[in-house]
């Protein structure tokens, strides 16, 4: 570790010591989501299950609530409920990452943990340079940087980042999000026999592949894995135009299902499907744990989307992760469900049956800033709605076959909405934290995630219907 690296870490810890008490005094501070101690959190990085613990690294800017030269922060857990903050994993201290240790991934080999990340560099004229870098650890806590292992191939701009690494039949592969020189987004592949020397194989898909036309000017945060006999590519394309209810956020995150031919190499796949229908979801990354489960974490925000309006900025922090979600395939569709381990947080269970007929009433929610609500056995003539703390509303419009999530904008000046189409509604599973809501529809067929910032004194959660609606409701306080 260089003297400059030590100095950056010292300054970051000093910032935490100075500002974390202010951050923790914020009524919007989350109770059961990963968030930064201070400063800005964005993409989950290096998510991995290793030696009995889940590791989630994250993009972290400790000195401000705007983006800048990123560190890698680090949390671990053994039960996916109680998270421990570990020491800083990476600091932007070397010539190859001096403007940020950008996103990447983790793998294990010979009982060591290998972190791959993008070193972001600006030259003296402000021009971007990009390097794919490696750091290695014996204990999973302290990492030794090994420097650059892959450089920019011809035909691409320096928007070339976010390596995700895995092993297949004795060879290591790395997928990277890329932008071609003619400003088209692609996912490209490298291969290695030893994790330190990488050869460029070429693009596997992108704009102009598999029937895709112009499909964004940049693809970020690719993740490629096998699931139930198919290959799944998760990616966050930038530059998609809104299309009906689709692509409503500034940038998108979604997936393709298909088959990767490692010899060509080429990914043959179907259409792109968004992972989350809500307001705040980006840069997802997955791991496989010791039970063989494919688990996803994502950043509960979108770059360049109202970030400056978050009220938490006044308390020196911004952003959080989604809850971890287990992924399964149903045909060509990814199903996302909250991990069963989260049930360990449940306290004060209430089970009720509600029957509404052109009426409304408050649900017996004790702590709406830390609550789980499960609606089951739903029967409704025309639909119903759930209003959450006067700031967000979930509604089902049966005739149109649409579910809607509305919220007050962060500046409080307007109401915003996101919609998705469903054939029928059987279950609604809500997780309400101090400043977020995640809603799983029909056991994870669709998910809507959003940050929201209710008035701390408003604790009311109400259900209403214009026609006849009845359902069974489970409510838990989450501790």
Swiss-Prot record:
Induction: Induced by sucrose. Expression is regulated by the antiterminator SacT. Pathway: Glycan biosynthesis; sucrose metabolism. Keywords: Carbohydrate metabolism, Glycosidase, Hydrolase. The active site is at residue 43. GO terms for cellular component: cytoplasm. Substrate binds at residues 40-43, 59, 102-103, 161-162, 220. Signal peptide: none annotated. Belongs to the glycosyl hydrolase 32 family. This is Sucrose-6-phosphate hydrolase. It comes from Bacillus subtilis (strain 168). The lineage of its organism: Bacteria, Bacillati, Bacillota, Bacilli, Bacillales.
